[in-house]
Structure formats: C-alpha cells, structure tokens
C-alpha cells in the first residue's frame, strides 16, 4: 500500500508542476494539434469530452465549436446553458454576454430576441465566423445528434424550479447516446434527481471531500473533479470503491491524462487533446 501511495504522490507532483508551470503557455497557445493526440498517452480505456465544444479552434459554446468537436470524433461535447429572461435555454458560460458577445447585460435580464440582435465576437477562430449568433439548447442537441456525440450539458444558471424545462426539452427526443447533466450547484442537482431518477448526473467540485462522496451517493450522481487539486488523487479510490463514476476537468496535458487513466478515471474533459 505504501508503494502505491508513493507512486500516486509522484503522479500528484507531476500534475502540480505541470498545472502551475505549463498552464500559462498552453492556455495562451490553444490551437489543437495532432501532437496532442492520445496515442502516446495510454492504452487504457477512457472517453474524451470537448470542453465548451472544441474551443481551441472555434469560439467556446458556439455551434461551430460543437461541429468541430463532432468532426474530430469526440465521445462527448460539454457545453454550458442558462435560461434567458423569457425562459429560453441558451448556450453560454458567463452570467452576462459582455465577455463573448457584442452587447452587454445579464442573461437573466435579456430576452432571447434581444440576445439574437448581438453577435459572438470573442474566441478562438472568431475571424472565420462573422455574424455568429448564440445557439439554443435544442440547436446544440441537434449538432450532437448529427455526429452521434454525447451531449454533456452543464447547467450554469436558473433555479431549482427551472430544471423541469430542461428535462422537457430532453424528453421530446430519442437519443442514440443519452445526454448527461453536470452542475456545481447542489440544489439544482438535487432538484434534477428528484424530477428524473434515471438521467445521468455528475456533481462538479473542485475538491473531493467526504461530503462530496456522501452527496453523490445520496443523489446517485457521478463526480466531476478538478485535476489540478493534488489531494483529489488520494480520494479517487475512496469514491470508486463506493461505485461512484469519476470524471476530471479540464485536462490539456498528456502526462496528466496518463495519470488519470492509470487511476481508472475514464471520463476526461479537455480543451485541446484530440481523440
């Protein structure tokens, strides 16, 4: 056991060094490249998810980013959604449109029609997509289905009572690969589980704590954790031994991918590692 823990500790040290020293460079130089394919990383089974679509080559949380993820052959595309003032679920990460769009204002205070008057004007490859508009949850699902790519839907806004409207949208479709819901908010996770006992849900956290594992067990969810927190690597087996599915975000370096796969973490979200 001590030898195993020592090996894990060495892995953690590698992770910490990589995340602290190399992250700055790679997050600036974000273009996906064939040298970041997984062939050299590991032979273990795992599933790659494109973070906010393939956001290294197209604007995050946009239709082109999902299209590029589908063309690249990702297992799943992760994207963020929140409801507008009039209840339309749109694909965007921030509470406001300010960072990624031509307008200003909070999503919850803007109608869908008002947001459609704006364009997405920020992100990788934006010069290739003039007049790019925001997409709805329905439109995002259409693209995922087109490529037989699983939809990983992160709820970024809305209240517990809004979760039914998401399930209503999903319930109108027959999926080749069932979508899954991910969320940092305990109340929304609990509400979603109460409404649907079968849909796959992952509770997102920075740190895997005792109460994280208990909450996941009580609500029959997986756990999505931050790869850059060293202590998480010592909790992986605790969670797995209790039947909890684990996923890690956001992994952009092959040595880290190799460590996670060695620890049997099968679901990996990335900005730039190609399938």
Give the label of every model feature segment.
Residues 2-275:
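Phosphate-group recognition and catalysis centered on beta-loop-alpha active-site segments
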């Amino acid at each position: 056991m001590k030898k195993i823990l020592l090996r894990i500790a060495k892995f953690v040290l590698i992770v910490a060094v990589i995340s602290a020293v190399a992250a700055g460079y790679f997050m600036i130089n974000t273009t996906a490249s064939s040298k970041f394919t997984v062939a050299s990383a590991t032979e273990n089974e795992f599933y790659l998810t494109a973070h906010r679509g393939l956001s290294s080559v197209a604007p995050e949380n946009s239709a082109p980013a999902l299209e590029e993820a589908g063309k690249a052959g990702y297992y799943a595309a992760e994207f963020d959604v929140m409801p507008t003032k009039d209840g339309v679920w749109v694909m965007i990460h921030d509470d406001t449109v300010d960072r990624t769009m031509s307008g200003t204002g909070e999503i919850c205070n803007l109608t869908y029609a008002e947001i459609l008057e704006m364009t997405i004007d920020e992100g990788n490859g934006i010069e290739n997509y003039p007049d790019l508009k925001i997409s709805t949850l329905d439109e995002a699902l259409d693209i995922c289905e087109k490529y037989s790519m699983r939809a990983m839907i992160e709820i970024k806004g809305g209240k517990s009572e809004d979760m039914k409207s998401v399930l209503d949208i999903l319930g109108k479709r027959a999926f080749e690969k069932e979508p899954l819901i991910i969320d940092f908010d305990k109340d929304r996770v609990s509400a979603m589980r109460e409404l649907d006992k079968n849909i796959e849900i992952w509770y997102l956290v920075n740190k895997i704590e005792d109460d994280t594992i208990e909450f996941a067990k009580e609500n029959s969810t997986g756990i999505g954790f931050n790869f850059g927190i060293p202590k998480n690597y010592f909790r992986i087996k605790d969670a797995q031994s209790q039947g909890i599915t684990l996923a890690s975000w956001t992994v952009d370096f092959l040595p880290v991918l190799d460590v996670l796969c060695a620890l049997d973490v099968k679901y990996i979200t990335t900005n730039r590692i190609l399938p």
